[in-house]
């Protein structure tokens, strides 16, 4: 349900991030609170991370649970440098170990196969 990714706001230290992937509910079960219950449970399960992150298909679900959009530009770190990803968007969840963050700063994540965000 989540993978460890290392997000880095600007030139600040890397943040150990629980990056959530593949949240979906079968259409016939939507609207019954299943995804909300799973995401609430997930928030308690990832409390030892510095940050929660995801790329939302349905932002309203996450917004009502405290997730907020990163407002600054997004980049992917590669061995050759940073790649701008202006088409990407991410939301973050502040956790007990989350440092003070300026969400307008650029943020980068390490390269991964498949979808970058």
What is each residue range found by the language model?
Residues 1-23:
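A conserved beta-strand-loop-helix scaffold within acyl/acetyltransferase catalytic domains
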Residues 3, 36-42, 71-78:
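Short acidic (Asp/Glu) patches
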Residues 4-6, 28, 59:
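Short coil/turn motifs at secondary-structure junctions
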Residues 20, 25, 30-44:
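Conserved acetyl-CoA-binding loop-helix of GNAT-fold acetyltransferases
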Residues 21, 50-52, 87-89:
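Generic beta-strand structural signal
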Residues 48-52, 56-83:
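Conserved active-site alpha-helix within GNAT-family acetyltransferase domains
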Residues 76-117:
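C-terminal "cap" of GNAT-fold acetyltransferases
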């Amino acid at each position: 349900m989540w993978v460890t990714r290392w997000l880095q706001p600007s030139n600040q230290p890397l943040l150990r991030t629980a990056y959530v992937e593949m949240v979906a509910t079968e259409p016939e079960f939507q609207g019954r609170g299943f995804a909300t219950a799973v995401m609430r449970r997930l928030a308690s399960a990832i409390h030892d991370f510095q940050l929660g992150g995801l790329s939302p298909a349905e932002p309203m679900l996450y917004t009502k649970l405290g997730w907020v959009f990163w407002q600054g530009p997004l980049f992917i770190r590669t061995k050759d440098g940073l790649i701008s990803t202006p088409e990407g968007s991410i939301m973050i969840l502040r956790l007990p170990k989350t440092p003070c963050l300026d969400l307008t700063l650029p943020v980068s994540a390490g390269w991964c196969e498949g979808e970058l965000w």
